[in-house]
Structure formats: structure tokens, C-alpha cells
């Protein structure tokens, strides 16, 4: 995104750098929020929708913004594309503060920002090709060039044979692919995805997220994903911003937030994604056998396997009875529930030492 006061609008064409499918890609947009506040007024009452927002989204990255309903996620996105303006603060896109720009300049700027939505927002009266071509028609792109661009985009999103189909003939996943193709039509450097997968089933969600990864990987576009599903963040994002009541309560790499959440809100979201702590029924069944049960958060650098070796050396029987370990941003991470059975006083002492060591290094909970 150009940082000049008068951003230019280039018309992409097949075969040019930055055109869809070109592995050299586009340079993504850097986004910086500085002390951003948004206040809505309802009569004499003030509603602080955003409060003291400070964050930086690196160019070419994928960031997930997560929070419960009313947290301020969608309001934040509307500040980025200028559909709403903050009460105070700065929003810099590649170093250019967009807050004071007149609407005429913001319209030009929006051609560099793609948007996909939960409900797809396709024109039912236009076929797939017509929907994808719509922003190009608004730009005044010549018909032949427009048709080439649409063909290229449909191939990129895996819908080469659907150009003449109408939205009512498509599945939810196919509709969202059309939405992504349309969002890419003007060759943006920034893509905003507002709850783009929340209306889709899990399998289709995975397919759409893989397509967004392809967009980021091959085109270099910065992607901001608004969601209330931590699994979406886990699957696609480089970093995560956790919002609550209009504030950023936590932010960091996905691995950092997953492995060591600092707030209750973040911890609750992480728990919904991992789902590897025994529920009440499972816990009762596990407690029917001898031994003590511990659920341990696995992360690198906690000395877990050394601690397990010490337990075994003390004659403690160690069984993994629940959970699993996965790879997250090239780090091992997960939760394991262990049954530790001591057969001597030394074994009981070793279990206490294990518990103490894990408390100092990670999260551990004894299931009683």
C-alpha cells in the first residue's frame, strides 16, 4: 500500500507481478494502531467500543483477532477500512495515517483492501463470473482484461468450472471461495476476513482456511481474521490479539498465547480449541483406578521428559490416559493427563517433587 497522500489505484492484469498465481506476490500492508479509541453516543450515554488500542500487524502476516460477541472485533476492522473513524488516535497503513483522510481518498484506499464476510454478500442476480468481475467493472477495467482476470481468479480459488453458475447453485464453501476471488480482484495488499468461516461446517472451514493460507503464502497479502473460534486462529494465524470489552487484553504469537495464556479470557479460548482435558464423566471414570491423576500443559523448555524419567527411576508407573501433543508454529504443544502410581514411599515422594517442579514450569492440575 502506497504511503503517499494520494494513493494510486493500479489495475492488475494476468502475468504481471502481483497478479493472482504469481509466486512473487504482493507486498502486504503493515497496520499500526496508536492510542485508538472509539466512542459511540446513545443519547447522553457514551459507549466505549474501543479503548486505548495499541498494536502492530506486520506486513505479510496473518493475525487473528478473537473475542466474544461485543468485544469490539468488528468495530476494530471498520476502523482499518475507514468505514468508521476513531474518536481519537492514529491508524497507520504502511506509515500513512488514514484517520484524517477525506472520504474521496478513502475510497481510493479501499481498492487496496479486500473484504470477505460471514454471509458471503454475493449478488444473487449475477453469476459467479459476474460477482468476481463486479469490482473490476467499477474500476473501469476493459472487458477483455476483466474476463482474463476473472478466469485467473476462479482458477486460483478452485472454481474454474463455476463461472456461469449462480450463487443459489453453490455450496457454502463455494460461495466463500467466490467471495475470496472477488476480494482479490483489485489485487489488494490487505485482506479483512470478518467471521468468514463461522457459517461453514468443519470440513469446509478447513478448506477455506487452507485457501487463505495460499493467498498469504503465494501473494504476500496481509490477512486480518476476525473470529470467535480459537481453532481458526490456531489453524491459520501467525499471531493473535485477544479482545474484551473494547480493549486488547492479550496479544502475542499463537504459540505464546496457547502455551502460556496470561488472562482468563485467553485461557478460556485456548481451552475451547485444545479440548484435551477430561470432562467430568471421563474424569470420574479415570478416578476409578489406582494412582493420582494430573493434567499437564506440554510446552518446550519445561523439562517434562527429564521429570518423567525421574518418576520411572523411583519406581512410579506412568500412564498417559488422556490428551495429546501437537505441533504449533514448529513447537510441540498440548495437554496430557497422566496417571501416576507409586509403589513405595520413594515413589510418593517423587510424585510430590514432580508436581512441585511442574508448578514452577507450566500449568498442572491434579484431578481429584
From Swiss-Prot:
GO MF term list: ABC-type D-methionine transporter activity; ATP binding; ATP hydrolysis activity
Residues noted as binding ATP in the record, renumbered to the chain: 67-74
InterPro entries: AAA+_ATPase (IPR003593), ABC_transporter-like_ATP-bd (IPR003439), ABC_transporter-like_CS (IPR017871), ACT-like_dom_sf (IPR045865), MetN_ABC (IPR041701), MetN_ABC_transporter-like (IPR050086), NIL_domain (IPR018449), P-loop_NTPase (IPR027417)
Keywords, ordered alphabetically: Amino-acid transport, ATP-binding, Cell membrane, Membrane, Nucleotide-binding, Translocase, Transport
Low complexity bias locations: 15-27
SUPFAM superfamilies noted in UniProt: ACT-like, P-loop containing nucleoside triphosphate hydrolases
Membrane-topology descriptor: Peripheral membrane protein
Record's protein name: Methionine import ATP-binding protein MetN
Native organism: Corynebacterium jeikeium (strain K411)
Amino acid at each position: 500500500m502506497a504511503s503517499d497522500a494520494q494513493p494510486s489505484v493500479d489495475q492488475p492484469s494476468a502475468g504481471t507481478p502481483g497478479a493472482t498465481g504469481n509466486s512473487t506476490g504482493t507486498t502486504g500492508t503493515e497496520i499500526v494502531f496508536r492510542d485508538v479509541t472509539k466512542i459511540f453516543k446513545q443519547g447522553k450515554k457514551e459507549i466505549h467500543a474501543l479503548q486505548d488500542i495499541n498494536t502492530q500487524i506486520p506486513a505479510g502476516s496473518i493475525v487473528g483477532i478473537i473475542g466474544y460477541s461485543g468485544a469490539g472485533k468488528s468495530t476494530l476492522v471498520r476502523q482499518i477500512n475507514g468505514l468508521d473513524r476513531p474518536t481519537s488516535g492514529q491508524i497507520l497503513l504502511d506509515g500513512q495515517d488514514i484517520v484524517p483522510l477525506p472520504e474521496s481518498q478513502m475510497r481510493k484506499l479501499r481498492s487496496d483492501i479486500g473484504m470477505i464476510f460471514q454471509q458471503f454478500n454475493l449478488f444473487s442476480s449475477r453469476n459467479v463470473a459476474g460477482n468476481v468481475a463486479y469490482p473490476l467493472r467499477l474500476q473501469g477495467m476493459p472487458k477483455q482484461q476483466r474476463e482474463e482476470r476473472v478466469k485467473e481468479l476462479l482458477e486460483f480459488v478452485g472454481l474454474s468450472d463455476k463461472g456461469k453458475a449462480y450463487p443459489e447453485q453453490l455450496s457454502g464453501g463455494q460461495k466463500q471461495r467466490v467471495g475470496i476471488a472477488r476480494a482479490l480482484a483489485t489485487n489488494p495488499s490487505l485482506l479483512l476476513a470478518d467471521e468468514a468461516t463461522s457459517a461453514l461446517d468443519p470440513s469446509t472451514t478447513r478448506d477455506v482456511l487452507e485457501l487463505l493460507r495460499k493467498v498469504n503464502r503465494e501473494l504476500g497479502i496481509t490477512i486480518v481474521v476476525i473470529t470467535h473460534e480459537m481453532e481458526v486462529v490456531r489453524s491459520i494465524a501467525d499471531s493473535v490479539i485477544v479482545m474484551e470489552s473494547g480493549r486488547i487484553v492479550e496479544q502475542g504469537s499463537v504459540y505464546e498465547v496457547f502455551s502460556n495464556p496470561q488472562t482468563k479470557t485467553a485461557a478460556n479460548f485456548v481451552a475451547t480449541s485444545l479440548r484435551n482435558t477430561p470432562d467430568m464423566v471421563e474424569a470420574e471414570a479415570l478416578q476409578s483406578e489406582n494412582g493420582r491423576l494430573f493434567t499437564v500443559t506440554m510446552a518446550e523448555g519445561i523439562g517434562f521428559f527429564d521429570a518423567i524419567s525421574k518418576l520411572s527411576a523411583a519406581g512410579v508407573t506412568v500412564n498417559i490416559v488422556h490428551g495429546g501433543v501437537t505441533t504449533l508454529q514448529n513447537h510441540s504443544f498440548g495437554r496430557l493427563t497422566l496417571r501416576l502410581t507409586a509403589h513405595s514411599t520413594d515413589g510418593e515422594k517423587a510424585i510430590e517433587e514432580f508436581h512441585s517442579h511442574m508448578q514452577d514450569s507450566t500449568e498442572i492440575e491434579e484431578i481429584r
